[in-house]
Amino acid sequence: MAVPTFVDRVTLHVSAGRGGNGVASVHREKFKPLGGPDGGNGGPGGSVTLRVDPDVTTLLDYHHSPKRRAEHGGHGAGAHRNGAHGADLVLPVPDGTVVSDPQGHLLADLVGPGTELVVAQGGRGGLGNAALASAKRKAPGFALLGEPGDELEIVLELKVVADIGLVGFPSAGKSSLIAAISRARPKIADYPFTTLVPNLGVVSAGDTTFTVADVPGLIEGASEGRGLGHDFLRHIERCAAIVHVVDTASIEPGRNPVDDLDVIENELTRYGGLEDRPRLVALNKVDVPDGRDIAGFVVDELRQRGLRVFEVSAASGEGLRELTFAMAGIVEAARAAKPAVEATRIVLRPPSVDGSDAFTVTATPDGWRVRGEKPERWVRQTDFSNDEAVGFLADRLNRLGVETRLAEMGAEEGDAVLIGDPENAVVFDFKPGVDAAAEILSRRGEDQRFDESRPAARRRRAIEEAMADRAEGETRADVARRLDRPAREDGGAYGPQSYEIGGRDDPDWAEEDLGE
């Protein structure tokens, strides 16, 4: 199978890097107790950027490797060390590349060297526990996870940036003409559809330098997909002028140059968007006797239509100087009317769901679905293996008003609550805490609903239970034995009791006091 050398349309799957995770760490140093949290933040993931490179003329590289991924961000570390930034992935594309989504919606038109489009943003790094510390939460035992980077499919379509476009039937001599007026060396042969890909040539006429595109041959029905023209008509959309190259030497029975020009014009009209471009007509191959005669028959009719007609020969060079200077005049006028293109940087940002702070709650057969930029981002940042992190999420959702909204809409304890899009939603059981308007007595970052399962709470509860069991099993004799004192014969208990000051029951009484 032949390997393509020119590709002007590809579907590219791009993935930005994931942000690094924050870390929960406590400062430890000799003679410095209670050093406090020192967990660093995760680094942001790398982004995917398309950049116009004048040295790139095809999308062939992305045809062979259609999946591209940027680097992930590094994780945070102790001692306030932040994770490394993921390296951005820069993909060079030809000048004139159009970027769209798989549904055909235009995202950007990249024109001008250095123009950039950030198609996929890297994920933000998670915060370490040092950044989460506050007056009420002095030593968080958790950190936030890094967010995933953007991942999407885009369609790259090349529309050659040329000043002049050559159009005509197959074997009209377009490739020979561009080879004669420039240093381009396209494939030339005496059979139709020799040219299978557009050829670009740089032409100089006086002080003006411009580019000419040789489009593969058009036939009737090209705008509907016949022949090769349908795939390459896009390459003349940016041209300042269109030159009809008409073969005057090898006319088939029933055909003439005027009819050929009308067929091509009809296809350009049906393709659309080219009606306002100036037209030039190059009657080619006049070096052949029959060609010169036929050109003489049709030149007046074409000029009566208001067309500028040139009798040329790509083989001998006849008429090429006049043709190229006419092209240069049109190009100069078009450039003067068009502002200069400066390199720009475009960033694609997916639209937020109902604004950055807003959220929606919808009843579904599966439960209650919550959508919103903040709730969905908070869920992605949460480490669900850490109870304190889950409590922090519950606190944030409560403060945002999610629990209050669910209660107002009739949600009951135990109902399923789904946060996020249907494909990646996280499911919770609705367990309402305190009212959102009431004061939250637990520390921020902790949740009373999870307090009993925390390790510190379990240890405290075990000690309390052991002390209670021991107290119940001790008798007064056990207490006396533990205190190394004999049990009182009267059965009285050791410990606080009433007594007369100076009497024998006074704990400060001594035998020497009797002598006084």
Curated annotation (Swiss-Prot):
Keywords: Cytoplasm, GTP-binding, Hydrolase, Magnesium, Metal-binding, Nucleotide-binding
Basic and acidic residues bias spans: 466-491
Major site of localization recorded for this protein: cytoplasm
Domain OBG-type G: residue ranges: 162-332
Domain OCT: 351-432
Region feature (Disordered): 466-516
Listed EC numbers: 3.6.5.-
Localization, UniProt: Cytoplasm
Lineage top rank: taxon: Bacteria
GO cellular component terms listed in the entry, alphabetical order: cytoplasm
Binding sites annotated in the UniProt record for GTP: 168-175, 193-197, 214-217, 284-287, 313-315
GO BP term (any one): ribosome biogenesis
Cofactor section: Mg(2+)
Segments forming a coiled coil: none
Gene Ontology MF, one: GTPase activity
InterPro entries, sorted: G_OBG, GTP-bd, GTP-bd_Obg/CgtA, GTP-bd_prot_GTP1/OBG_C_sf, GTP1-OBG_CS, GTP1_OBG_dom, GTP1_OBG_dom_sf, OBG_GTPase
Enzyme kind, highest EC tier: hydrolase
Chain residues that bind Mg(2+): 175, 195
Subunit structure: Monomer.
NCBIfam families tied to this protein: Obg_CgtA, Obg_CgtA_exten, PRK12296.1, PRK12297.1, PRK12299.1
Protein name: GTPase Obg
